[in-house]
Structures are given as C-alpha cells and as structure tokens.
C-alpha cells in the first residue's frame, strides 16, 4: 500500500541574500509556482505553502494553491513546519516533507523517495537524501554539506568540513586525495514524522548547530535517528542569490514551462 504524505513548502520573503526570492520570475512564473509543480509530480496527498508574507500567499492562491500564513519570526524552516503541523492538527504518525521554496529543480521523484524512505524506517524521526560528491572542490567547499552514515544508512554527523578527513590524501603524505566519490553531499530535502516536528521547537539548541549553521544537528544531538538514502538522481541547483537565476532559468527552459 502506498504511504500518503504531505509536502509543506516554507517560503520566507525576508531572505538576507535575496529578499522576495519566492516571487522571483522564472520563465514568466514566480519561482514558488515551479516548486509547487515539483511537489505535484511527487504524488503527495496534500501540498501546502507556508509563508509569512501576503504577496507570496496571494501569488499562490491565484494558482489555486493551499496556503498557511505563519509567524514571521521562525528561526528555521523546521520551526515553520512545526507551526503548520500543530495548527492543522496533523497526526503524530503522518509524514511531512519539507521542500524548500528555492528548489525549483528538485525532482518530484526525490520528494517521493525521501517520504517513502522515512516510511520504511520506523525507528527514524527524519529521513533525508545524499549524493556522491563529484569533485574535490565540492568536498572542500563549506557550501556543500557532507554527511557520514553508519552501515545501516543512519547519519553519524553532518558538516561543512570535508568529513571523513582523508588524513594521507589531504596532508599530501600520499600524493593526491582519493576519488571524490568517497564523500557524500547532503541534499536539503527532509521528511519528518509529525510527532518529531511537535517536539522540535522545544529542543535545546545543540552546541555544534551554531558552529556549523546546520539545524539537523539539533536532532542528532538529542538522539533522533536520521536515515540518509542515496538519491535516485542528482537534482539541479537551488537559488541562493539573484546571480543563480540565469542558470536555473536555462535549466528549467530545457525541461519545458510549468503547466
């Protein structure tokens, strides 16, 4: 039997690097519309946009999207999801996927994959995905979050540093570092059980969370198991700054305009 799941798309207006980002035009449509189309391709039972801004809400409602207005002071997208889950009265065992509002190239099949991965691992509170790194520059980049898993695929740690550290390769003692395929790059796509989302806002922040600026470390620090699956495909890039729009628009044009 197919596991039903809900996709919630947090869409914040006041991005530091790109204010109003969800409304940025891509192929004549607001970016948030493209993200909603990716969610629809996943086969989700329900799709909601969670936003703190009336213009974003208006743009979504014009296209018939379900919108939940949230507080503007949430420190993270996970906190925003927690508010939505609480307000909608979702059951603790329901699965919610957090699809970021700046990921118009995230394939719907990956959204579905992460939801089904969580459903298959009952002892996990969270599921997420990773891909193999493709270059040593990617391994070393602090913008590419790396993850180390145990033998069953559960996360041991996430870091902006190149983990695991190649002692010989990176020190130069044994020549060039190993193939970049030895490292896993984390994708910022999560599935949560609603029971965990309800607990999250009350959890004490973890010391490494602030150092790394990675909110998933809070869950690990509190003993929540995070299952990390290998993504069935490599997604296109997200939109962090206005400079990213041209590349993303070109890639979207190759896929065809949204319906």
UniProtKB/Swiss-Prot annotation:
GO terms for molecular function: 3-deoxy-manno-octulosonate cytidylyltransferase activity. Pfam families: CTP_transf_3. Its main location: cytoplasm. It is found in: Cytoplasm. One of its GO terms (biological process) is CMP-keto-3-deoxy-D-manno-octulosonic acid biosynthetic process. It is an enzyme of class 2 (transferase). Keywords: Cytoplasm, Lipopolysaccharide biosynthesis, Nucleotidyltransferase, Transferase. Coiled coil: none annotated. The keyword Nucleotidyltransferase applies. Disulfide bonds: none annotated. Pathway: Nucleotide-sugar biosynthesis; CMP-3-deoxy-D-manno-octulosonate biosynthesis; CMP-3-deoxy-D-manno-octulosonate from 3-deoxy-D-manno-octulosonate and CTP: step 1/1; Bacterial outer membrane biogenesis; lipopolysaccharide biosynthesis. Belongs to the KdsB family. Activates KDO (a required 8-carbon sugar) for incorporation into bacterial lipopolysaccharide in Gram-negative bacteria. This is 3-deoxy-manno-octulosonate cytidylyltransferase. It comes from Alkalilimnicola ehrlichii (strain ATCC BAA-1101 / DSM 17681 / MLHE-1). The gene is kdsB.
């Amino acid at each position: 039997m197919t596991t039903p799941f809900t996709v919630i798309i947090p869409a914040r207006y006041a991005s530091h690097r790109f204010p109003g980002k969800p409304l940025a035009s891509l192929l004549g449509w607001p970016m948030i519309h493209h993200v909603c189309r990716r969610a629809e391709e996943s086969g989700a039972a329900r799709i909601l946009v969670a936003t703190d801004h009336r213009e974003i809400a208006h743009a979504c409602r014009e296209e018939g999207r379900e919108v939940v207005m949230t507080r503007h002071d949430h420190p993270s997208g996970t906190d925003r999801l927690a508010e939505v889950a609480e307000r909608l009265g979702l059951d603790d065992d329901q699965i919610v996927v957090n699809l970021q509002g700046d990921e118009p190239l995230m394939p719907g099949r990956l959204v579905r994959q992460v939801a089904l991965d969580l459903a298959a691992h009952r002892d996990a509170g969270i599921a997420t995905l990773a891909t193999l790194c493709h270059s040593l520059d990617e391994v070393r980049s602090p913008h590419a979050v790396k993850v180390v898993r145990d033998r069953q695929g559960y996360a041991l740690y996430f870091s902006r540093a190149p983990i695991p550290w190649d002692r010989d390769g990176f020190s130069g003692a044994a020549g060039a570092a190993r193939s970049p395929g030895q490292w896993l790059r984390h994708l910022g796509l999560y599935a949560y059980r609603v029971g965990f989302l309800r607990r999250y806002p009350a959890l004490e922040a973890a010391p490494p969370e602030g150092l790394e600026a990675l909110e998933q470390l809070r869950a690990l620090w509190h003993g929540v198991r995070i299952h990390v699956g290998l993504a069935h495909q490599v997604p296109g890039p997200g939109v962090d700054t206005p400079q990213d729009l041209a590349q993303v628009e070109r890639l979207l044009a190759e896929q065809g305009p949204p319906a």
